[in-house]
Amino acid sequence: MSGLSIIIPAHNEAAVVARTLRSILANKLDRPLQIIVVANGCTDQTAEVVRGFAEKVELVETPVGSKTHALNLGDRVAKYDLRAYLDADIELSDNALQSVVDAFKDPTVRLAMPRAKHTYRGRNPLLAGYYHLWRSMPYVRKGAMGGGFYAIDKELRGRFREFPSLTADDKFMRNLAKPQERRVVEGCFATVTMPQSLGDLLKVKTRWTYGNLELSAVRPDLNANDQNRHEGALSYLILRPWLWFNVPLFVFVYVYAQLAARKRFALKQAIWERDESTRPFPRTTAAATPAAHQAA
């Protein structure tokens, strides 16, 4: 029986990576498990935190602050054909690993992921309303928005040599698989803590939008495998007037992200603006350089 290799790129994630590792180790799996954390360009205590799990977690360190580089380094260390890739700030439910692995019993499945659970822990009623509306959108409910965790089989991994230098590495992988080859596994979760402030939300949405533009330009051949995020949204809203109060902020965030991302894309300004509101102080910042925009 083949095992599962999990690769976790981590850039200055000392505040959250232990929580993520504990959630993985709380899972039971019917096969060998290899956990690899690639600490890339860290200036905090990420590596030291990971060493606290030394008996069960392999640590790879690189001075290059690049998520793409970290993913490729992790892939070189991985020893199993079944691979999973996990963001360092994501929590898995205790049945996620087995449930996702079981999805590959279907020979047509090439990529599997748990249902994403997007949580907002702040107290701003406007942001709470925004997330309520966003989570209710058809494309989100269908699982189009990933939860920072996905697993792939050997066949899908064979469709590319190395991870390309893209902001939207997760969407690249998702679109590499045809819709009928993807599986969102119900009954298990990957918990994503959403930005707690409007400023951080705008940064993250701009990054997502930039990543979509970049992927579409670099790999237009994958557009056919993408999902129309706007399909059914208007009719859904028209029939639910109790959501209308949240529409103005929703539209503002969408328009802001579109304009900001398109401007930066036109100027070839690669970005990686992550949400710092869900990471306790001290905060870290990354300059808008080709290396920094790929930092995990």
Task: Name what the model sees in each region.
Residues A15-A18, T43-G52, N95:
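Acidic helix N-cap motif at the loop->helix transition within catalytic regions
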Residues S23, A39-A47, V64:
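A conserved acidic beta->alpha catalytic loop
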Residues T62-A78:
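Glycine-rich, basic loop-to-helix element that forms the pyrophosphate-binding segment
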Residues F104, H118-R121, L126, S165-D226:
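Catalytic donor/gating beta->alpha subdomain of glycosyltransferases that bind UDP-sugars
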Residues R83:
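Short aromatic/hydrophobic "clamp" motif used to bind/position activated sugar donors
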Residues M194-P195, K203-A296:
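Terminal low-complexity segments of carbohydrate-biosynthetic enzymes
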Residues N12-A26:
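Short, well-formed alpha-helical segments that are part of the catalytic scaffolds
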Residues D94-P125:
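Conserved donor NDP-sugar-binding/catalytic core segment of glycosyltransferases
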